[in-house]
Structures are given as structure tokens and as C-alpha cells.
């Protein structure tokens, strides 16, 4: 355990207690009083809403035109089959989408293990029941798998050309999150003579496509990334962009193409040898308005895009361009 300059305790590394293959407890201590609820609530919300995963988003079933179609020899109605498909636990090793198929001859039970997969896709709950065939009939499906996070209703993912979509393509509400349940508790902890400290205990259950430790680590990374922007309050001077880690802020080394300006604005800047964001922010409004074919509308666009990144025109940079940045707009 270490203590920072302002005497705020830094907790030890997390302790992992695996309860089952899909459930574990993560313990973090010691924490300053009140930090248990602060961190526990934040981690719980991120774990439930923002951990990426895979889900079945679209289904085509031979002979089924819509969700209310009746299928001869199928015990369940189509809506129930779609609900069962939403609970299939899927993991992909690479890529963001895939199309799988399922074919089964009845009578008998159809499970997730009947889905045909390749080396890139795993089904973690193969015994999960999808439907029952009561007669000597076959069922054939095509399943679209996509990567995402959180919960996305079907209506939110319908494309503008929805009216022309193929008849029989059923769009599902998708729950991408691999985290099924998260609860946390704050218990008392002590260090030497201090007895007013917190111990955070997170109880997390997943669908098996990710282990609890990795889920908590991912949630912590997301929180850390979101909070990192507040560091600028301390380290950035209002009139100048300060280098990070005794170097140049990586954002300033990004090409102006990353700003996604209109083609007209981008071409005007490049014609004036403005290739990097660092080149651009050192220009004043007056200087840019002197650029041929760049008017007030383009200037407004540039200012708005920079403001979204916490930057502005007329900023001062020391030692620009840094070593490795060539005048022709390529990193050396």
C-alpha cells in the first residue's frame, strides 16, 4: 500500500475469488471512506452498460415472413424462438460481424450447439434450447452476429432503406453486454490504527464469453479514459497547448484529415501547407481568411471542429514542428 502526496490511500491490487465459471467476486481495499460507494457505483454502471460483446441481431427462417408466422411442426411460436436466440452466448476471436446458419431435422430439440460455426466463432452455452420440433420437419435459419455494447432495440438499428429490406429478415432487439448481473457491497476495513476505511466487494456474473476479472479491467479502463480529459484542467495553459510527457501532444500530430472537414476546407488548408492539427491551431482567424477560397463559412466549420477537441485558433506551440514531421505533410 502506498500513500500519495495528498495522503489519499492507494488500494492494493484486486483480489479475485472465482465462485463458478461465470461468477466471481472482486475485492479492492483499502479505500478512503466514501470511495467504496463512489467507485463501486461507477464500475457497476459501466459494467452493465459499456462492456462490448456479440449478439444475434438478424434472423431469417425458411418459410417465415414475419414474427407472427405459424410454422407447422414447431412447438414454440416464432416470437418465442427469437427470444431464445437472444440468449445465445457468442464469442468471436476477430472481426465485428459474421453470418452463421442452423439446420435441424425433427422431431427433437434444437439447441445452440446446432448452430454451425467456424474457427472464429464460439458458442458458450451449447445446451441452450432454441426450440422444439414435434414432427418430421426441418428448420433452417441464417443468423447475423454483430459486435456492440449495451442494449439496442431493433427500431434503433433499422436502416434508412428499411422499406426495401428482404421479406423474412427479422431484426432482433440486441443485448450485447456479456455481463448478466453486478452487485457491490462496501464493508469496513482498517490499516494499522485507521478503522474508518472502505473495502469494496463486487459480485459479477457474465454469460461466459468474458471472465469477471477481464470485465472489471475493461470497465476500469473505460472509466480511466473518460476521466483522463479532466487532467487538462491542471496541465493546459489557456493560451498555449502544452506537450504531454515532455513531448508533443499526439493529437497535434494527427493529420487535418482526422478533423473530417469538408473537402473544400481541407484542400484550402493543404494548399497553404497546413497538414497537421498542430499547423492549424497556430494560425489566426485573420491569417486563415487570407487563404484563397476559404471563406467565413469554412472558418466557422474549422473553429467548431477544433472546439470539440478543446483546441482553438491562435494557440502557441514551442519547438514546432517537432523532429520527424516533414513540411510535405508526412511523418518522418
Curated annotation (Swiss-Prot):
Alpha N-terminal domain (alpha-NTD): annotated span: 1-234
Coiled coil: none
Keywords, in A-Z order: DNA-directed RNA polymerase, Nucleotidyltransferase, Transcription, Transferase
Highest taxon in the source lineage: Bacteria
Entry's EC annotation: 2.7.7.6
Keyword Transcription: yes
GO function term, MF aspect, one: protein dimerization activity
Region called Alpha C-terminal domain (alpha-CTD), residue ranges: 248-332
Record-linked SMART domains: RPOLD (SM00662)
Catalytic activity: RNA(n) + a ribonucleoside 5'-triphosphate = RNA(n+1) + diphosphate
GO BP, one annotated term: DNA-templated transcription
Pfam families: RNA_pol_A_bac, RNA_pol_A_CTD, RNA_pol_L
Cellular-component GO terms for this entry: cytoplasm; DNA-directed RNA polymerase complex
Role according to the record: DNA-dependent RNA polymerase catalyzes the transcription of DNA into RNA using the four ribonucleoside triphosphates as substrates.
UniProt similarity note: Belongs to the RNA polymerase alpha chain family.
Subunit structure: Homodimer. The RNAP catalytic core consists of 2 alpha, 1 beta, 1 beta' and 1 omega subunit. When a sigma factor is associated with the core the holoenzyme is formed, which can initiate transcription.
Record remark on domains: The N-terminal domain is essential for RNAP assembly and basal transcription, whereas the C-terminal domain is involved in interaction with transcriptional regulators and with upstream promoter elements.
Protein name listed in UniProt: DNA-directed RNA polymerase subunit alpha
Organism: Stenotrophomonas maltophilia (strain K279a)
Amino acid at each position: 500500500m502506498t500513500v500519495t502526496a495528498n495522503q489519499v490511500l492507494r488500494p492494493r491490487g484486486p483480489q479475485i475469488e472465482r465462485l463458478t465459471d461465470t461468477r466471481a467476486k472482486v475485492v479492492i481495499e483499502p479505500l478512503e471512506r466514501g470511495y467504496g460507494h463512489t467507485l463501486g457505483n461507477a464500475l457497476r454502471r459501466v459494467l452493465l452498460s459499456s462492456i462490448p460483446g456479440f449478439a444475434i441481431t438478424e434472423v431469417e427462417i425458411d418459410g417465415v415472413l414475419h414474427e407472427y408466422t405459424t410454422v407447422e411442426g414447431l412447438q414454440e411460436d416464432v416470437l418465442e424462438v427469437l427470444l431464445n436466440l437472444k440468449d445465445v452466448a457468442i464469442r468471436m476471436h476477430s472481426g465485428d460481424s459474421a453470418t452463421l446458419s442452423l439446420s435441424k431435422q425433427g422431431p427433437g430439440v434444437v439447441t445452440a450447439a446446432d448452430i454451425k460455426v467456424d474457427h472464429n466463432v464460439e458458442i458458450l452455452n451449447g445446451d441452450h434450447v432454441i426450440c422444439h420440433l414435434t414432427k418430421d420437419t426441418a428448420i433452417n435459419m441464417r443468423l447475423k452476429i454483430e459486435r456492440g455494447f449495451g442494449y439496442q432495440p431493433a427500431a434503433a438499428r433499422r436502416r434508412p432503406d428499411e422499406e426495401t429490406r428482404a421479406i423474412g429478415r427479422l431484426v432482433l432487439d440486441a443485448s450485447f453486454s456479456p455481463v448478466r448481473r453486478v452487485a457491490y457491497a462496501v464493508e469496513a476495513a482498517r490499516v494499522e490504527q485507521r478503522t474508518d476505511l472502505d473495502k469494496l466487494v463486487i459480485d459479477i456474473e457474465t454469460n461466459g464469453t468474458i471472465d469477471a476479472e477481464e470485465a472489471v479491467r475493461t470497465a476500469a479502463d473505460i472509466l480511466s479514459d473518460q476521466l483522463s480529459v479532466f487532467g487538462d484542467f491542471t496541465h493546459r495553459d489557456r493560451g498555449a497547448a502544452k506537450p504531454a510527457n515532455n513531448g508533443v501532444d499526439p493529437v497535434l500530430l494527427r493529420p487535418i484529415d482526422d478533423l473530417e472537414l469538408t473537402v473544400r476546407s481541407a484542400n484550402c488548408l493543404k494548399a497553404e501547407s497546413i497538414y497537421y492539427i498542430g499547423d492549424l491551431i497556430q494560425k489566426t482567424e485573420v491569417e486563415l481568411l487570407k487563404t484563397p477560397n476559404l471563406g467565413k463559412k469554412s472558418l466557422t466549420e474549422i473553429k467548431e471542429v477544433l472546439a470539440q477537441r478543446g483546441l482553438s485558433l491562435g494557440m502557441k506551440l514551442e519547438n514546432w514542428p517537432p523532429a520527424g514531421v516533414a513540411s510535405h505533410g508526412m511523418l518522418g
